Structures are given as structure tokens and as C-alpha cells.
């Protein structure tokens, strides 16, 4: 399910009931980090994960890290500075593990040696969104870092699972 431009509240109120329930992938945070305190953000995230677990009991839930931004974006908006994002991602990982969910650290695939969004993945003026190459790297990371399922074969064109 892709929910670009929708709020987590909108997702919580109905969109999820119409989606496939083989797996659920959650990414919440980039916009919310700007508008909420860290404590409010983590409380909301915890509640959201609890609701998903309750509503979709038995369905694997993959909680994704917040993706890195450019160094320039972190200067413009301190909540999106990559050191801060790493701290929040650590808290998100702890939340996921404490609730028995999977955690995917996309930073491994998207960040450069300094922890910033790789330059060849930057796609827009905002330093947050990626270009098609970046999104492809992200999708590849997800496909290669989730629990194996024959269902995934339709998305894999190379490698040992193709």
C-alpha cells in the first residue's frame, strides 16, 4: 500500500482495511518529526503499531526506519538532521522489537558513509525525497531483508530467489 500525502490518522481510519494482508509495511515519521515532539511522536507510533497488531493479528508487520535526508536538509530543519533521525530510528527499532514486529533499517541501503542520503539517490529540491534509483534501492532492500515467501517471487528478477 502506498499512502503518499496521507496522514497516519487517515490510514488508521480505513485504508488499511482494504489492503492485502500478507504483510504490512509501516513507515511513519518524516513529516511527523517536524510537527511533534520526540515523545509525542514515539507515543503516537507505539499506539499506531498496537492498533495494527490488534486489527491484523497474525500478519507479519515490518516497521521501517525513517530514511536519511541530505546534510543540507538537516541544517534547514533540525528534526530531520540525520543524527537525530538515527536516535529516533533506534527508538523505533526498540518499539518494534518490544511488540514482536520486524524492523527494517533502510539506512543500510540509502545512507552514505556520513549517514546522509546518498548523493546519487537525491531526487528533489527538498533533500528528503529520492530519485527512481534511490527508490529502486529501497525496494530492493525491502525485498532482500524480509522473511522469505513464494509470493515475493513475482517481484524478484535476479539472485537466488528469482
PLM feature spans:
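Conserved SGNH/GDSL esterase-like catalytic core that processes O-acyl groups on lipids
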Residues: 1-47
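Short, flexible, glycine/charge-rich loop motifs used to bind or transfer phosphoryl groups or to couple energy/partner
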Residues: 13-16, 52, 118
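Structural recognition of the beta-strand scaffold that forms the well-ordered cores
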Residues: 23-28, 32, 60-65, 102-105, ...
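Short hydrophobic alpha-helical module
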Residues: 27, 52-55, 83, 95
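Generic structural signal for well-ordered alpha-helices
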Residues: 45-50, 89
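Internal catalytic-core helix/loop-beta-alpha segment
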Residues: 49-58, 62-68
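Catalytic His-Asp segment of secreted/periplasmic serine-dependent ester chemistry enzymes
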Residues: 68-162
Amino acid at each position: 500500500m502506498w499512502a503518499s500525502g496521507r496522514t497516519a490518522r487517515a490510514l488508521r481510519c480505513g485504508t488499511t482495511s482494504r489492503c492485502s494482508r500478507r504483510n504490512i509495511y509501516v513507515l511513519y515519521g518524516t513529516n511527523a518529526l517536524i510537527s511533534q515532539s520526540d515523545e509525542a511522536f514515539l507515543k503516537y507510533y507505539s499506539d499506531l503499531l498496537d492498533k495494527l497488531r490488534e486489527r491484523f493479528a497474525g500478519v507479519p508487520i515490518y516497521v521501517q526506519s525513517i530514511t536519511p535526508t541530505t546534510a543540507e536538509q538537516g541544517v534547514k530543519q533540525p528534526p530531520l538532521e540525520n543524527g537525530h533521525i538515527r536516535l529516533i530510528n533506534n527508538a523505533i527499532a526498540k518499539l518494534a522489537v518490544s511488540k514482536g514486529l520486524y524492523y527494517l533499517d533502510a539506512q543500510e541501503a540509502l545512507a552514505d558513509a556520513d549517514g546522509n542520503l546518498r548523493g546519487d539517490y537525491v531526487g528533489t529540491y527538498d533533500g528528503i525525497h529520492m530519485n527512481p534509483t534511490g527508490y529502486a534501492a529501497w525496494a530492493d532492500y525491502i525485498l532482500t531483508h524480509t522473511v522469505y515467501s513464494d509470493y515475493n517471487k513475482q517481484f524478484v528478477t535476479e539472485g537466488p530467489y528469482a
